[in-house]
Amino acid sequence: MERGLEDGLLGESGVALVGSELSLEDVLLAAREHYKHLPLCAVQEWIILDAIVTDDERANVIAAGCQPMFLFAHKVLHDEQRRFEPGDWVRSSMGTTFKEGFIFATRNTIYVLVGPGQRKPASIEAIFSIC
């Protein structure tokens, strides 16, 4: 990953948050109680990126059933569908909800946020530059 991303967008200038502090097994069980049908992906060293959008863009995103937010995680701990190996990084599609302080949902995956993380605003261009 480029150093500029590490220093800026993915650096440590956001609002500090704390995800679940349960064991991996326990946090997956807790998430499964709320979400029975979507695959779970547990991550560490995560950042919720709030997309900077206009009011019209926000209205369109919300009308489509989403929120203008994305998740980036430096480290995948466990992915039920094995799309990602432990230790891989991941950037989500647009989020639908962020609940309980550790559950970030998209239309196709429930991301379980473990340990410390952060939340910060970012441009759509910056978010999609993460690849």
What is each PLM-predicted segment?
Residues 101-115:
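Amphipathic alpha-helical packing elements
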Residues 1-98, 116-131:
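N-terminal non-globular leader segments, chiefly Sec-dependent signal peptides
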